Amino acid sequence: MYLTLLKSKLHRACVTHIELEYEGSCAIDSVLLSTAGIQEYEQIHIYNLTNGERFVTYAIRAEDNSGIISVNGAAAHKACPGDRLIICTYAVFERSEMDSFKPLLIYLDDRNFITHTGNAIPVQVA
């Protein structure tokens, strides 16, 4: 049996730009891509915490240490500068691989710099 699991997450990324006329995609600071293990052109799922929009696109590189998160093309209608996003990637695993796998969780500040990382989401309590 195969299961799709969270591979990586950029938590609370802040949109810095929207570029409607750009050729689709989401440009992400190259340091963030590398730290999260996201490949250029890899499919990403974006969850907009500000307005509730959810959409799928692909990642492209933005300048190192720029803090850029630019939502481009048609997806630019789904975000505004200042919106907070969760950007996720997923991977398919065999059940035998699941126990040893841990996702890369990258937590960001208001300027899209890394505050801390992790590999487990805390248990939600009442």
UniProtKB/Swiss-Prot annotation:
The active site is at S25 (schiff-base intermediate with substrate), Y58 (proton donor). GO terms for biological process: alanine biosynthetic process; pantothenate biosynthetic process. Pathway: Cofactor biosynthesis; (R)-pantothenate biosynthesis; beta-alanine from L-aspartate: step 1/1. It is found in: Cytoplasm. One of its GO terms (molecular function) is aspartate 1-decarboxylase activity. Keywords: Autocatalytic cleavage, Cytoplasm, Decarboxylase, Lyase, Pantothenate biosynthesis, Pyruvate, Schiff base, Zymogen. Its EC number is 4.1.1.11. Its cofactor is pyruvate. Its main location: cytoplasm. Substrate binds at T57, G73, A74, A75. Pfam families: Asp_decarbox. Binds 1 pyruvoyl group covalently per subunit. It comes from the Bacteria. Is synthesized initially as an inactive proenzyme, which is activated by self-cleavage at a specific serine bond to produce a beta-subunit with a hydroxyl group at its C-terminus and an alpha-subunit with a pyruvoyl group at its N-terminus. It catalyses: L-aspartate + H(+) = beta-alanine + CO2. The modification Pyruvic acid (Ser) is found at S25. One of its GO terms (cellular component) is cytosol. Catalyzes the pyruvoyl-dependent decarboxylation of aspartate to produce beta-alanine. Heterooctamer of four alpha and four beta subunits. PANTHER family: ASPARTATE 1-DECARBOXYLASE. Belongs to the PanD family. This is Aspartate 1-decarboxylase. It comes from Nitrosococcus oceani (strain ATCC 19707 / BCRC 17464 / JCM 30415 / NCIMB 11848 / C-107).
